[in-house]
Amino acid sequence: MIEFVYPHTQLVAGVDEVGRGPLVGAVVTAAVILDPARPIAGLNDSKKLSEKRRLALCEEIKEKALSWSLGRAEPHEIDELNILHATMLAMQRAVAGLHIAPEYVLIDGNRCPKLPMPAMVVVKGDSRVPEISAASILAKVTRDAEMAALDIVFPQYGFAQHKGYPTAFHLEKLAEHGATEHHRRSFGPVKRALGLAS
């Protein structure tokens, strides 16, 4: 992997999202400005860490970061805007929520939302840029907790296990029980479960 070269600036925020692919729940984003004086060991892409490690790092990030913020776009916004535009909106909300304005923003992936400060995308940034890794951890821990809470209300769907992704089990239960108000109605499998598409 090519080492990432930082822009010449002090306050850099990393931004990442979790939850573009699931059929249910919000897309959750996070923005993080790390403190160079308080390094955090072991930051990596949230998907490559155990749940226990993610939870521990999440608390450490919240404690040590100069600023952090969460953003989100709800299922109805995803349905109205489409998942790409809803994700960009959620990223804008995360950056706007930082109590320190970053001088530069680094975003995981290949699409950059409109922001009031310079920004650039970093492909595989969640593995290359600690600020993005930190954002990915906050977003994933937050969304996973939301899915666990939803699982208590709707235990028949198994949200705590598959986190809303279209697994065979989720699709089977969607066909059996129909969609909840938290399902994304613009997504094909949900449309089919509602009889809105063949």
UniProtKB/Swiss-Prot annotation:
Manganese or magnesium. Binds 1 divalent metal ion per monomer in the absence of substrate. May bind a second metal ion after substrate binding. It is an enzyme of class 3 (hydrolase). It catalyses: Endonucleolytic cleavage to 5'-phosphomonoester. One of its GO terms (biological process) is mismatch repair. GO terms for molecular function: manganese ion binding; RNA binding; RNA-DNA hybrid ribonuclease activity. Pfam families: RNase_HII. Keywords: Cytoplasm, Endonuclease, Hydrolase, Manganese, Metal-binding, Nuclease. Its EC number is 3.1.26.4. Its main location: cytoplasm. Disulfide bonds: none annotated. It is found in: Cytoplasm. The keyword Methyltransferase does not apply. A divalent metal cation binds at residues 16-17, 108. One of its GO terms (cellular component) is cytoplasm. Residues 10-198 form the RNase H type-2 domain. Its cofactor is Mn(2+); Mg(2+). Endonuclease that specifically degrades the RNA of RNA-DNA hybrids. HAMAP family: RNase_HII_B. Belongs to the RNase HII family. This is Ribonuclease HII. It comes from Shigella boydii serotype 4 (strain Sb227).
